[in-house]
Amino acid sequence: MEKNVIKSLIIEYQQFVEKITLIERDIHLSDQLNYVFVGLRRAGKSYLMYQQIQHLLREGHSIEEILYFNFEDDRLINLSVEDLDLIKVCYEELYAHRPIFFLDEVQIVTHWEKFARRLTDLKYRVYITGSNAKMLSSEIATTLGGRFIIQNVYPFSFREYLKANDITVEPAWYFKNRTEIVRSFSDYFYFGGLPELELIEEIEKRQWLSNLFNKTFFGDLITRYSIRNDLAMKVLIRKLAESVKHPSSFNRLSNIVSSTGIKVTTDTVIDYLEFLQATWLIFSIENYASKLVEKVSNQKYYFIDNGLLNLFLIDPETSLLENLVAISLKKKYEEELYFYHQNIEVDFYIPTKNLAVQVSYSLKEEATRKREITALLKIAKVMDVDKLLIITHDEEEMIVEDGKEIAVVPIWKWLLEQDSLLENR
């Protein structure tokens, strides 16, 4: 590739990232560490990179220090790892600064990881995004050799979603603009929080989500993992969506898929579940009360975004509610999040925070109310839990029973105030 082309692209990209308008994500990065941004397609990995660039500029760095390169640019064809070195050389011919590297979709270049390792060995700061189809596998993390922090990039939180829609969440929001916030929640609940959806008319959102799923399915799953039985994978995804509130063992999922006339082995299902998680379509949580083998083989599976889950549901409300709670808890607690099933059925349990959470669309039916309260009182006794919470669609109260307080909170309020509701009681 010619030097003059590379130099012009470096300058063009600098002008672009300096001026682009952003919706600030609630993600804060250290200026002293190297990062790989991972997540679902269109979750905002590149925009998080732009956000970090603009943060560095506000901190006093010059735009000339920024070496941002978008390897998906149509003007870049058949780049080699030697071209990566040439990009560095061209930058050094333009500027006397020590660059901060932002390599967007760099996985397109074969052996890119060798270049990334070399940069970190030379003490450069490096930020990387990449396609799930070629990058989000365990071998890449191993290849990078612990030199990078893996930053998970999720779709918008509800607070970020409101910010994208120019709705301010002030300290007194519950009294000032609660009606506007509740009205906006419906879209977020059914269509999810992928950033680009904010630019799309409501009538077209489902089609956009369907297109995204198909690109992820064929590009990140079928092609990346050389899956020959794509119909079996589709059936598995649909069955996971239908079972989103319940534990699903490997054997059960294998039997369910096979019952449709598509024969798959348990080992194949295990592989497929691993692939689905690697491409960020789903995530799983384990049963805290299970023995080690059962923790792995009988998990609960949730979708990374409500909009994608809703593609597969007919009566979606109860599943979407629990899925949205799962997403928010997963973002906050990561591997500390469990469910608890052992003579008690508790939807979510975070032992490090002494917290148990039930999810119920409504407590108006007496049987439902009794079931949810009883489960929390039992786990409070068995595991000495002192923070008890029921998340509903739109109901709120404080229940006091057997000397325990159980907060009942609507989902839209909990999403905006969960820090205080979860940990400061």
Annotated model-derived regions:
Residues 2-13, 133, 139-247:
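Interdomain motor-coupling "hinge/lid" segment immediately C-terminal to the ATP-binding subdomain
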Residues 13-32:
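Pre-Walker A adenine-sensing motif
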Residues 37:
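Hydrophobic anchor at the beta1->P-loop junction of P-loop NTPases
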Residues 41-42:
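Walker A (P-loop) phosphate-binding loop of P-loop NTPases
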Residues 45-46:
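Conserved lysine of the Walker
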Residues 65, 199-356, 361:
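Accessory nucleic acid-recognition modules appended to NTPase machines
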Residues 67-97:
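Short glycine-rich substrate-engagement loop in P-loop NTPases that contacts/grips substrate
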Residues 395-425:
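Domain-level recognition of nuclease-like catalytic cores that cleave nucleotide substrates
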